[in-house]
Amino acid sequence: MNLIAKLEQEEIERALAGKTIPEFAPGDTVIVSVNVVEGNRKRVQAYEGVVIAKRNRGLNSSFIVRKISSGEGVERTFQTYSPLLASIVVKRRGDVRRAKLYYLRERSGKSARIKEKLVSKDRAAQA
């Protein structure tokens, strides 16, 4: 392992101190809690939507979450190991056949729905 990879691994471990990032994939509905600083106040803001893309690049990993707010599509990119992320909760697993769901940008209503992934009894017993 070269020096840069070691430094990145140390930074990832430092960013994850006390936090756990769940396994999630494109198509999953997640609730991302973000620490927001307004003046001298600090609060947690929840952002719920569908993961349409995930980018695995070590310390530079990120994911894009899309939601519909007031009839308008809103996308937000989150850095996976950012200190501003308070927590990530997977609300629902989606069953998709693509890694990038950018086609959802052109769709609205029923055509933008994602099927729910059914968990087999074997997996449910393990979890």
UniProtKB/Swiss-Prot annotation:
InterPro entries: Ribosomal_bL19 (IPR001857), Ribosomal_bL19_CS (IPR018257), Ribosomal_bL19_sf (IPR038657), Translation_prot_SH3-like_sf (IPR008991)
Record bears the keyword RNA-binding: no
Gene Ontology molecular function, alphabetical: structural constituent of ribosome
Key words of the record: Ribonucleoprotein, Ribosomal protein
GO process annotations (BP): translation
Pfam families recorded: Ribosomal_L19 (PF01245)
Annotated disulfide bonds: none
Family annotation (PROSITE patterns): RIBOSOMAL_L19
Annotated GO CC locations: cytosolic large ribosomal subunit
Ribonucleoprotein found in the keyword field: yes
The organism's place on the tree of life at top rank: Bacteria
Family listed: Belongs to the bacterial ribosomal protein bL19 family.
Function: This protein is located at the 30S-50S ribosomal subunit interface and may play a role in the structure and function of the aminoacyl-tRNA binding site.
Protein name as annotated: Large ribosomal subunit protein bL19
Organism the protein comes from: Paraburkholderia phymatum (strain DSM 17167 / CIP 108236 / LMG 21445 / STM815) (Burkholderia phymatum)
